[in-house]
Amino acid sequence: MKKILEVKDICKTYQAQNGEIEALKNISFDVKEGDYISIIGPSGCGKSTLLSIISGLEPKTSGEIHIEGKIGYMLQKDNLLEWRTIYKNVLLGLEIQKDKTQENIEYTENLLKKYGLYEFKDKYPTQLSGGMRQRAALIRTLAVRPKILLLDEAFSALDYQTRLMVTEDIFKILKAENIT
């Protein structure tokens, strides 16, 4: 399988009142197409920082990252905009990237249909269950057609039973859409 993400010697330090804090030190790993990996550790150990660096949202202090293709990043909270319908929410990434072509709109509408949210497209986020909101957030992330998907505790706000169900749904979606 082809290597699609290479992380080499990533370091991240922050300035604090009493000196530097080393959040990440010499983190290295590769991800091949089709891999599913988990980054596990206690709160505050730098998992979210690492994902933010990989996605380009936060600068690294040193090291190298090589990415083959687009990255989709789904944060802990669904970050759906409450004043926008589900349909407008799932198109947001395409709007931001100025890539709202007819082909991409149709692709996104198909994702809504395929994953059971099309009939809720005119609803607002407050009208959906937690699991449905997470699926909408995932569809918004998938709409930009990422090759790599980063999930930062994307289901931590859900109860245990819903989390299991949504995790299983998402794994099926990633497999069906051929996303790493």
Predicted regions and their residues:
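Catalytic Walker B motif of ABC-type/P-loop ATPase nucleotide-binding domains
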Residues: 149-152
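Conserved ABC ATPase signature
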Residues: 124-128, 132
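Conserved ABC ATPase "signature" region
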Residues: 102-120, 171-172
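Helix-to-loop junction immediately C-terminal to a conserved catalytic motif
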Residues: 55
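Short helical segment in ABC ATPase nucleotide-binding domains corresponding to the A-loop/adjacent helical element
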Residues: 87-95, 105
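A short, proline-enriched helix->beta-strand linker immediately N-terminal to the Walker B motif
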Residues: 143-147
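The feature captures the beta-strand-to-loop junction immediately N-terminal to the Walker
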Residues: 40-42
